[in-house]
């Protein structure tokens, strides 16, 4: 998870540090949309951990699937933009890297959540025996 965040931050920092052009307006809007949805998802994940209540993990899984579909649609949209309009290769690279690492971040977080749920179930079962 930390590595995913590092890659996103480092790529964005290098883009700005090298004085590359800003992202296109639609790219910024798309990333804000993803960031908002991701923030809501992480709030749910945080609450699960806070309460140690993994009963709603199926709902969280559906939300995760929705987030992954959203980022994949945005990747497809960017590919279409590259085919039909003139785009800066550096902007496209940054945009792709942010979305792809976001997918990895979502997957890494969910793996951790699932492992924690399994551990809690094992612990409960072990106490009953």
Where are these regions (language model features)?
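Cytosolic, long alpha-helical scaffolding segments
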Residues: 1-129
